[in-house]
């Protein structure tokens, strides 16, 4: 009877943010009639790479804020590269998407393990941790990011030519 509190809502929203953001990307993939099993592995690679950028493990970073920006942007670029590789495999060799992404699903977790030497990434960078524990207007920062991603994806799917093409391809690839 005491579970309907703002604290419970806040905790639940915070816990689903990552899943919702990844789910938005998967929605776009599924809307095209495809499937991507490598999402979790790409999250592992990005999660392993991010602290390496802002802690200066890969190369010295003169400013913590530049390091944080690199720690956000470069893992997205790296994950996008792997996604493009999957797309290239599927288109160039006519491999079924489930098979191509299964390969990266398996290899990606290995890449993440090797890049961290199997160690847990532990870091104390308060400026970066603000993304996880910070609040804006009393709402966790992660929730704001999730809401923005959902709104942008909904707008793209409903109001842009690209979004309509994504939905059209999923309905009939030859159309």
Where are the model-predicted features located?
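Membrane-helix/interface signature in polytopic inner-membrane proteins
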Residues: 152-175
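Hydrophobic alpha-helical transmembrane segments
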Residues: 12, 20, 41-45, 69-77, ...
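Transmembrane helix-bundle core of multi-pass membrane transporters
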Residues: 2, 93, 97-160
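Hydrophobic positions within alpha-helical transmembrane segments of bacterial inner-membrane proteins
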Residues: 20, 24, 28, 41, ...
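Membrane-embedded helix boundary and interhelical linker motif in transport proteins
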Residues: 31-84
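Short, non-helical or kinked segments that cap or interrupt transmembrane helices
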Residues: 6-9, 28-49, 89-102
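Membrane-interfacial amphipathic/re-entrant helices at transmembrane-helix boundaries
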Residues: 1-23, 58-70
